[in-house]
Design a protein with these regions (language model features):
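Peptidoglycan cell-wall recognition and remodeling modules
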Residues: 21-145
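N-terminal low-complexity, Pro/Thr-rich disordered segments
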Residues: 1-31
Length: 145
């Protein structure tokens, strides 16, 4: 009788660990993540907010717009609309911010956390929209919608 319990428990645990990061997010956050991931490979254009080219805050604004959430256009203003969370407690859908002074007023870049230590960003003209890892280019702080 003891053998079936571990056999039953193991597949359940394996199944629970399999979903992709976007499916772990719920509701609008999953929609925002899926939208942003669908833009990977597209061009970066300063001030861009469409399939013709994205900049960092244009991408995050559009992703959340598709999810029914209104965000300001500028990265620093987006930081103002979030509640700060620890980088150790990130959840898919959180916004990641890079700042030259550690505060919202110094924010110069924003990306969307997708889970598993990864985020999607409109990086720069050379890289375009891509998935990057926190280990390779860590943000200064994060905010939750």
């Amino acid at each position: 009788a003891a053998a079936p319990k571990p056999a039953t428990a193991a597949p359940a645990a394996a199944t629970a660990a399999k979903p992709a990061a976007a499916t772990q997010a719920t509701g609008s956050k999953a929609a925002a993540i899926n939208f942003a991931l669908s833009k990977v490979g597209q061009a970066y254009v300063y001030g861009g907010s469409s399939d013709g080219g994205w900049d960092c805050s244009g991408l995050t604004q559009a992703a959340y717009r598709q999810a029914g959430v209104s965000l300001p256009r500028v990265a620093a203003d987006q930081a103002d609309t979030t509640t700060r969370v620890s980088l150790d407690s990130l959840q898919p859908g959180d916004l990641l911010f890079w700042s030259n002074n550690g505060s919202n007023s110094g924010v110069y870049h924003v990306a969307l956390y997708v889970g598993d230590g990864k985020y999607v960003e409109a990086a720069n003209p050379r890289a375009g929209v891509r998935v990057e890892t926190i280990a390779d280019y860590a943000p200064d702080f994060a905010g939750r919608i």
